[in-house]
């Protein structure tokens, strides 16, 4: 069964946070199809609207669909941003995150995307992680369960959170592992030439 995965695009989002899991999922699809198997993921980018926005650094991005027209999802991936305070105060953005989390069976974030999930109420009572520099700030919130350092990702069941930036690759591989199997995840890690630890260990804490 093909699983529908939406990646949220918004002004100021980090490119590596977005592109890491996006590339992993597309690569997993390509490897599956090469073996004569159906692609496990339907990957779509979604935004508050379908007008161009600029990611952090200025690169233009264009979402394929609006959040309000997405329908049911299996997974939503929320990237992070540099200006976390501005992101958590952005009412329309948080409303979009909340809507996507409600529509999806599984929510995921990369880096400071965890703060957007928290602001949307998705991390209450759940373990989570984020960029190592932002762990104290995430711990200071009262709407997050245990905040875990020293991990590339933390799987809390309904929500998976990734650490900083390049951890989006590891989070993407974990999603492939969890949803499509260890063998495809390992093959995907080899294809993208990324050293992957299926246990999500990380030297930074």
List PLM regions with ranges.
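A structural motif
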Residues: 141-146
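Structural detector of well-ordered beta-strand residues that form the stable sheet scaffold
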Residues: 107-108, 129, 148, 160
